[in-house]
Amino acid sequence: MTDTVPPRAALRQRSLVVKATSGLDRPEAANQAFTVAAAAVAAGVEVSVWLTGEAAWFGLPGRAAELELEHAAPLPDLLDAVLAAGTLTVCTQCAARRGITADDVLPGVRIAGAAVFVEEALREGAQALVY
C-alpha cells in the first residue's frame, strides 16, 4: 500500500488566495487573476479572490463585461466560475474610496478588510498570489 495522495485530493487540502489589483487599466493582469482562480476552482481547490484597487469595480454588476481581451476567456464567465464555488471579496478601504457599498456589489460578493485577507493568506495550506 502506498501513502501517496492522488493529485486532486491533495489539491482539495490546499487553498488559493488571489489578490487582484488591476482593473481596466491593466486588462491582462486582471484577466489572468481570474483565469488562475477559475482554473483552481475547476481543479477542486478552495479559492478566495480579493478585489483591490481598480479591480474593486469588478465586484459590481456589469463591470466585468467592460473588460475585453483578445484570446482570453470572457471575464464575466471567469467571475461566475469563482462565485459558483469560491469566495469573492472587495477590499473595505478600496470600496470606501470608490463609494462602493454592500448594496452595490453582486450577490455573493462580500466586503472585508485586511485582517480577513491576512487570516486567509496565512492559513495552513494556503498559497497567495498577487496580480
Question: Residue ranges of each PLM-predicted region?
Answer:
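A short aromatic-anchored loop/beta-hairpin motif
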Residues: 98, 102-106, 111-122
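Aromatic- and Gly/Pro-rich donor/ligand-binding loops
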Residues: 129-131
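Residues at the starts of beta-strands that form the adenosine-phosphate
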Residues: 15, 46-48, 87
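Positively charged, low-complexity intrinsically disordered leader regions
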Residues: 2-9
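Short, glycine-rich nucleotide/cofactor-binding loops
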Residues: 15-31, 62-63
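A glycine-rich helix N-cap at a beta->alpha junction
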Residues: 65-95
